[in-house]
Amino acid sequence: MIREERLLKVLKAPHISEKSTMVAEKQNTIVFKIAVDATKAEVKAAVAKLFEVEVETVRTLNMKGKTKRSGARVGRRSDWKKAYVTLKAGQDIDFMGAAE
């Protein structure tokens, strides 16, 4: 069993993009930004516990930070990790309802 403090640190935020919106509508999949050291099992447990839904699958991938310039200076954004969480049929996460 994963400690509750760890579950709260695994999920950072929902990742909102054109692709994530299409995937959410067609395949009942939610995309999250997650901690770089998080595992699939931790993500599955965190989503199930925090949103009270049943998770079918979790796919994770590491995103490389982009190189950015500001004048002559060249910098790099941090690497980050995201997870595609597919929910079982009939399950749904309502982010707007949770904000009220």
From Swiss-Prot:
Which keywords belong to this entry?
Ribonucleoprotein, Ribosomal protein, RNA-binding, rRNA-binding
Any single GO CC term annotated in Swiss-Prot or TrEMBL for this entry: ribosome
Q: What protein name does the entry list?
A: Large ribosomal subunit protein uL23
Q: Which organism is it from?
A: Aeromonas salmonicida (strain A449)
Primary role: One of the early assembly proteins it binds 23S rRNA. One of the proteins that surrounds the polypeptide exit tunnel on the outside of the ribosome. Forms the main docking site for trigger factor binding to the ribosome.
- Per its record, what are the GO molecular function terms? rRNA binding; structural constituent of ribosome
Annotated GO biological processes are: translation
Q: Which family does the UniProt entry place this protein in?
A: Belongs to the universal ribosomal protein uL23 family.
Q: What InterPro entries does this protein's entry cite?
A: Nucleotide-bd_a/b_plait_sf, Ribosomal_uL23-like, Ribosomal_uL23/eL15/eS24_sf, Ribosomal_uL23_CS
**What does the subunit section of this Swiss-Prot or TrEMBL entry state?**
Part of the 50S ribosomal subunit. Contacts protein L29, and trigger factor when it is bound to the ribosome.
Spell out the NCBIfam families in the cross-references: PRK05738.1-1, PRK05738.1-3, PRK05738.2-4, PRK05738.3-2
